[in-house]
Amino acid sequence: TLLANTRIIAAWDQFKNSGPAPAGYSYGTEYSTPTDLINAGADTANIYSYATHGSHVAGIAGGSGAGTEFRGIAFESEFLITTFLVDESAVIDAWEWMKNTADAQGKRLVVNMIWGLYHMQAIDGNSLLSQALDNYSSQGVVFVTSAGNNGGENFHIKQDFANDSLLTRINFYNSTTLSTLWGQSVHAWGTPGEEFSVGIKVLNTSNVLVGESQYYSTATTVNYIDSFVVVGTDTVFFNLSCDAAYPTNGRPQARLRVKRPSGSYRVVLKSQAPSGTVHYWNVTELTSDVGNWGMPFSSLGSGYTAGNDSNGIGTPACSNSAISVAAYAANFYTAGGTLAGGAPANFSSTGPLMNDTLKPDISAPGIQVTSSMSSYTDAAYTTITSVDFNSRTYDFARLSGTSMSSPVVAGVVALILNANPTLTPAQVKDIIIQTAREDSHTGVLPPEGDVNWGHGKINAYLAVQTALGVVGTVEIEQ
């Protein structure tokens, strides 16, 4: 609070290759002293320019508040920070670096992840990335992840086939608002032992067919195809990758990427299968190979299928050991003294996974959360309050998302481990689940949890009491 010392132990900017890289790695730059951190100021402007996501999240998890009322949950915790490349191996490198650094200091490690993707391997908890996460969890690392912000986005279809077909419109993100937009990425996962086929149709604004690709089967298609559909003087480009049986789960899968058409054409996904169930997701993709917000599958009339917002949890929140966090509005008192808030966030992604595993695990406040902003950001925001320090102004502002609810839980996990450092990640997760609270918004939740709320709302006080082994009656004001 006095701003006398930094609590950031080290940071690894994987985008900056001037070095020095961390020991054992050949890329990125590590900052391991207060002087290095101060001189660096911020991470490299990368695919998101100079953002403020990480600063806001860190402030929620454990910010000191800098003399304001906006103090984080575990406000005496220390930090390791990584800006990682969009690559599975880079993510695992970041985890390994964090674990080694924490082990060297004799500290427990909580990894908070406020990112999510739908194309980084299988999203059923069985991918190699999820297996790596589970392995680190078995070594004592606790992982907390945001559930995602695709609630209300009808970007998913679950289709049961019996020698029939599926037609649905692939809606595209507005290309005039994002210079790095590439198009849409449709991800499809089928039933183990089955096969399915995909392709596209191109319609004009009157829904008349003007072009069409062939069907590509997961059973016979080579790993990668680059192709196009010619429509008059225009061309609709697409590419496709397939697996007959994905190595980690045995499921047939296809990733169909369609570049946004230059004209006013409508692109339709066509798919067919002799039997089995196939899940489809329609996700925006940028030129940098990222993008995690869904766009709707919609109907164009008879014979078409519209999407839904179910099964919206991506990687890494789908991992079995991870604590996946949904969002809701925090309670507050109105000027008249009435208790308000508590409703679920309409943007919070819902479960379950495609193998029916229950996710999310828990929910926490994630709407209009006030926290610290990066003083280097070029993002637009409304300042709530500011602190001047060393001739620089540091703002606090409100943001919403499961990126805000996840660090709340990460901070609670840090408090739990501070109370009882001997707990395993599985025990920590169990404490959070068993002490979760219900209210008039959640209703009575089933023992197995709920696809919107998980096992309920986080109860920090009771969770820490349980970690301490304290037995007693606790009255929590809803």
Label the model's feature ranges.
Residues A104-Q121, G125-S127, Y136-A147, E153-H156, ...:
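C-terminal subdomain of the subtilisin-like protease fold in secreted/lumenal serine endopeptidases
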Residues T1-A4, K107-L109, Y118-T145, N150-E195:
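Conserved, well-structured beta-alpha core segment at the onset of a catalytic domain
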Residues G276-D309, S324-A330:
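Long, charge-dense accessory insertions within large macromolecular proteins
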Residues S55-G59, S89, D93-E96, N100, ...:
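Solvent-exposed, polar/charged alpha-helical surfaces in well-ordered, non-transmembrane soluble domains
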